[in-house]
Swiss-Prot record:
The active site is at residues 113, 249, 279. Keywords: Acyltransferase, Cytoplasm, Fatty acid biosynthesis, Fatty acid metabolism, Lipid biosynthesis, Lipid metabolism, Multifunctional enzyme, Transferase. Signal peptide: none annotated. This is Beta-ketoacyl-[acyl-carrier-protein] synthase III. Pfam families: ACP_syn_III (PF08545), ACP_syn_III_C (PF08541). One of its GO terms (molecular function) is 3-oxoacyl-[acyl-carrier-protein] synthase activity. InterPro entries: ACP_syn_III_C, ACP_syn_III_N, FabH, Thiolase-like. GO terms for biological process: fatty acid biosynthetic process; secondary metabolite biosynthetic process. Its main location: cytoplasm.
Length: 322
């Protein structure tokens, strides 16, 4: 049986940092207020010259080096982003051109904060079907470009950055047990007004700003993520104690805590980077994975659980054996 095996991870963060104290000079807030409600201390934001495709390219370079893979070996690139540089061409083709991945198909997807897991599921399916062998998945976002910096309910939440994974197709006998074990993707378009931007190319001609019904989204996030995780574990004949590490979308530490409490999962098994990165949408999971691997926390053979929820609303969960 053919499996999608994780081989490398990379990340990129813009140099500019905005702390909660910096924000207190812009809107009516304090470091204590933001941290207590979200777990966020600071966020990285793009400056002139930092584009989503450039950040994606830099993260991809590190991931390819980590995997020991050359650019010409890559045959699939998917970029998950809700903040592309242009309507067209896609960020993925820009990355392909910058890296010299001349043998790779390339396209973008947009499932907002769930985008990286949607991309992971597509890559897994294509590798298993024999349509790709070495794939690059990138989540890259410039959320600061769609934030109203006068709205304290949203501007404190988001940051910019990029993260990337490399996957290889391998036979089960080559690396027994390793690879993407299972994925569950979900959506509920009736809740599209819970989190959205008030603009778009065909509607207003402008990107617009993020609008959010925070309390409603919070409640749905806790219920939907915990339910999806339970369903995935049950279908995989696993219990929560089987999980070595949980890497959730880094949206709000209170959501994460409520989810793990519902599941009975130890906080010691949760990888958090929200304090340093804030909510980087589709980039948050690979950014957290990169930091955990660099710190030596995540090891070969570990079972890692991913979970994310975002605008749409969309949500997804995935199990990966390293």
């Amino acid at each position: 049986m053919r499996r999608s095996v994780f081989c490398g991870v990379g990340a990129f963060l813009p140099a500019k940092v905005i702390t909660n104290d910096d924000l207190s000079l812009m809107v009516d807030t304090t470091d204590e207020w933001v941290f207590r409600r979200t777990g966020i201390k600071r966020r990285h934001v793009v400056e002139e010259g930092d584009t989503v495709s450039c950040m994606a390219t830099e993260a991809a370079k590190i991931a390819l080096e980590d995997a020991g893979v050359s650019a010409t070996e890559v045959d699939l690139i998917i970029v998950a982003t809700a903040t592309p540089d242009k309507t067209m061409p896609s960020c993925a083709t820009m990355v392909q051109g910058s890296l010299g991945c001349k043998n790779a198909a390339a396209f973008d997807i947009n499932a907002a904060c769930s985008g990286f897991l949607y991309a992971l599921s597509i890559v897994d399916s294509m590798i298993k079907a024999g349509q790709a062998n070495i794939a690059l998945i990138i989540g890259s976002e410039a959320m600061s470009k769609v934030v109203d910096w006068t709205d304290r309910s949203t501007c404190v939440l988001f940051g910019d950055g990029a993260g990337a994974f490399v996957f290889k197709g391998q036979d089960e006998t080559e690396k027994p047990g390793a690879g993407v074990m299972s994925t569950l993707l979900c959506a509920d378009g009736s809740l599209g007004n819970v989190l959205y931007t008030n603009g778009g190319v065909a509607s207003t001609g402008k990107a617009g700003y993020i609008c959010m019904k925070g309390t409603v989204l919070f409640e749905h996030a806790v219920v939907k993520l915990s339910s999806a995780i339970s369903a995935l574990l049950e279908s995989s004949a696993l219990d929560v104690d089987s999980i070595d590490w949980f890497i959730p979308h880094q949206a709000n530490v209170r959501i994460i805590d409520l989810v793990i409490n519902r599941l009975g999962l130890s906080r010691d098994k949760v990888i958090l980077s929200i304090d340093e990165h804030a909510n980087t949408s589709s980039a948050s999971i690979p950014l957290a994975m990169y930091e955990a691997k660099r710190a030596g926390r995540i090891k070969k053979g570990n079972l890692v659980l991913f979970a994310a929820i975002g605008a749409g609303i969309t949500w997804g969960v995935s199990l990966l054996r390293l």
